Amino acid sequence: MTEIVAEISGNHGGSLRNALRLIETAAEAGADAVKFQCFEPERLATRRVWRPEVWALSGGVPLVDLYRKTHTPKEWFPILIDYAEFYDLKWFSSAFDPKDVAFLETLDCPRYKISAFEMLDWDIIKAIKETGKPIVLSVRPRCGLTILEATQYEGIHWNTETELGLSAHGKRAPFPGAPMVEYHLRLNDVETPDASFSLRMAELQEMVRIIRG
């Protein structure tokens, strides 16, 4: 059965209460899990500054400013994790830097996602692989070559603990047999940089209905 993941991303708009509301919304919509994003704005902006495809998606906003608006403070993570577990939601996180992985390991992160933009970042791949935890690779249209290149990294032996999951922007049903599909979730009354490609609760409920058949 396809696992349905609600991506919290930066749709909390810098509010812990909104982040908790997103977890409540994910549970009410029928998601199986929530995913967080763990990064420090300055470090992520530095690591991505040379990526033209990232700049193309930033709308001309300096990357560090964009990431400051969308990051989830590390001090929130224990609270968010407890809240997700209260609602019987599984949780995991993306990590974008080896230091993020080290932090998430202190919280016993059960699995990690490598985002599409980091799939050829050998430092983060190595750091995550060394945890021994399951890994989720992000699948987007036309990224097959990138996945192939990522799996050729020396010392990385991808196995049954590596999953391919569709990271969907907007309303997109998963490809048949997908083990996982991830949708960005938003609140009706909060506008954020991620809101335009995120689903409201009713839309996520509809996708759950379609996927579950």
Residue map of PLM features:
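Catalytic cores and adjacent flexible loops of soluble metabolic enzymes
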Residues: 1-213
